[in-house]
């Protein structure tokens, strides 16, 4: 009896146990392991620029350290950085967010954690179009929500349609996660597509969590459009989420930010004050320089990403049994390996694309 009681008291969280480990990190670890063995491997797992953070941003951080800017800041970030983000929202996104509508976090994942903690009650549903960034459903589950996956197809350019969205809505729907430019497909929603989605969100009355982390990485004649900029009704229902990790090669600095209603921002700030307190003070100073300083390094990185995009897309499409849609944003190419399924390699039948990838990385 005592043992039974003791074992019950040591039981771990069912909520945490339901969360799946990150397969992205597993892929990255596999690539590093093979590199350590001396094999020539290029890791395509983690969404991380291979450039160093621009020098002017690093110098701003060094100055912050030397100036003693190493104390606590307000939990939701400094007014200086909020003002810089507010200006960026206005000029780049066409969005008016005052500083009290902005919450600065410890990276994009933290922003999403804040958002879903603030929005979700147990059992609330969050619609997530697939393919999706792997952390979305896990963060929703940790907040007590239920991920509702809506599969998109290659024929749809892997983009959610208003019709499919409306069909997925129930009386428990609390929010839609809309990621554009998209990780992992590289697809970009047009204004027409966004307006149709916004119409459903307004009519059915749910929030839109607009993950726009790759907003500055758009190619060709395409243009990034923020769904919150398409009218007051959708603006009021949207939490716009972005950060500096991808565009400024600052993945390790951990600065993300959101724009939302004052009510939601206040609640997210309160949540963050108890979970982590403020974002790194030095990284906040660096972020101010990133947003307000010279942008030439960003433009050079963008040009190099575009060059790689074209190269990767052509190489994949030239390979037998592989195909892809041309990515319009971010720095991903979503490979279609379905033609390989059912074929055999050294007597082993290939039944999934991950299995094919495992064979390639181990055999070649």
Where are these regions (language model features)?
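Substrate/cofactor-recognition hotspot
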Residues: 16
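Glycine-rich phosphate-binding segment of PLP-dependent enzymes
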Residues: 53-72, 86, 91
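PLP-dependent class I/II
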Residues: 3-12, 20-22, 27-30, 34-41, ...
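Acidic/polar N-terminal loop/beta-strand segments that form early-domain functional surfaces
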Residues: 46-49, 75
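Conserved N-terminal alpha-helix of the aminotransferase class I/II PLP-enzyme fold
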Residues: 72-105
């Amino acid at each position: 009896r005592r043992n039974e009681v003791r074992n019950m008291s040591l039981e771990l969280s069912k909520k945490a146990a339901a969360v799946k480990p990150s397969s992205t990190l597993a892929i990255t670890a596999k690539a590093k392991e093979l590199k350590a063995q001396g094999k020539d491997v290029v890791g395509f797992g983690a969404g991380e620029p291979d450039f160093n953070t621009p020098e002017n941003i690093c110098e701003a951080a060094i100055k912050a350290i030397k100036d003693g800017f190493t104390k606590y800041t307000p939990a939701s970030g400094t007014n200086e950085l909020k003002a810089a983000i507010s200006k960026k929202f206005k000029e780049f996104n066409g969005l008016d967010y005052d500083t009290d509508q902005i919450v600065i976090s410890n990276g994009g994942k933290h922003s999403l954690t804040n958002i879903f903690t603030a929005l979700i009650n147990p059992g609330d549903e969050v619609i997530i179009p697939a393919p999706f960034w792997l952390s979305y459903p896990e963060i929703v589950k940790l907040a007590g929500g239920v991920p509702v996956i809506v599969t998109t197809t290659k024929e749809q350019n892997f983009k959610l349609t208003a019709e499919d969205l409306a069909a997925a809505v129930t009386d428990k729907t609390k929010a839609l996660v809309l990621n554009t430019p998209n990780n992992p497909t590289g697809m970009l929603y047009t204004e027409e597509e966004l307006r149709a989605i916004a119409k459903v969100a307004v009519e059915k009355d749910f929030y839109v969590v607009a993950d726009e982390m790759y907003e500055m990485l758009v190619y060709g004649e395409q243009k990034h459009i923020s769904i919150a900029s398409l009218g007051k009704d959708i603006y009021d229902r949207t939490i716009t989420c972005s950060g500096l990790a991808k565009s400024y090669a600052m993945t390790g600095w951990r600065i993300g930010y959101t724009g939302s209603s004052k009510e939601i921002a206040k609640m997210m700030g309160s949540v963050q004050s108890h979970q982590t307190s403020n974002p790194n003070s030095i990284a906040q100073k660096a972020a101010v320089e990133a947003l307000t300083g010279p942008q030439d390094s960003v433009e050079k990185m963008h040009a190099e990403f575009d060059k790689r995009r074209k190269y990767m897309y052509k190489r994949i499409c030239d390979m037998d049994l592989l195909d892809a849609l041309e990515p319009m944003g971010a720095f991903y190419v979503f490979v279609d390996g379905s033609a390989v399924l059912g074929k055999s390699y050294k007597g082993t039948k290939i039944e999934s694309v991950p299995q094919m990838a495992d064979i390639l990385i181990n055999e070649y």
